[in-house]
């Protein structure tokens, strides 16, 4: 029997989960309906607690190939739900949790500044992550992890990288 981790079992193929995709499609539909003012179209029913649970799970992905995709999807789910229901306290809590878990501290400061995890270990991990990702000479600004990895290689004798615009290359 081949050894595996619980993370590999949990996250392998999650992006193909029919219920997750059904929820995602309904969220996108409702967001498009709201964005374009198509109130004549019926709103699709969404189980917000289920969508938030999926976002929470995806934000904790350790999948070897799809970790970044899962974490981006988690952020998208909570951002869209927040746009649909900006006054929902449960969505606000998950928004802060997901953004913190994926180390999107800029997003936390903009959209979930009041978020504080109920878990002590999460709060400690967040503080350590924030200190690690802090931009030198900028007290309340943080790199994304990929940006930090690039920044740390600037002093190497040979350095080259290629990345999509969404990485924020000009910011580095």
Show the residue positions of the predicted features.
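N-terminal helicase ATP-binding lobe
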Residues: 1-172
């Amino acid at each position: 029997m081949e050894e595996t981790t619980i993370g590999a079992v949990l996250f392998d193929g999650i992006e193909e989960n029919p219920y997750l995709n059904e929820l995602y499609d309904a969220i996108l539909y409702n967001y498009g309906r709201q964005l374009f003012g198509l109130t004549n179209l019926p709103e699709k029913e969404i189980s917000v607690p289920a969508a938030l649970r999926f976002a929470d799970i995806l934000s904790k992905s350790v999948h070897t190939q799809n970790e970044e995709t899962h974490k981006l999807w988690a952020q998208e789910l909570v951002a869209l739900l927040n746009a649909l229901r900006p006054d929902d306290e449960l969505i606000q809590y998950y928004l802060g949790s997901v953004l913190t878990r994926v180390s999107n501290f800029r997003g936390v400061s903009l959209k979930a500044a009041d978020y504080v995890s109920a878990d002590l270990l999460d709060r400690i991990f967040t503080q350590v992550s924030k200190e690690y990702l802090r931009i030198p000479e900028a007290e309340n600004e943080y790199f994304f992890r990929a940006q930090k990895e690039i920044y740390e290689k600037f002093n190497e004798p040979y350095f080259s990288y290629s990345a999509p615009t969404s990485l924020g290359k000009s910011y580095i």
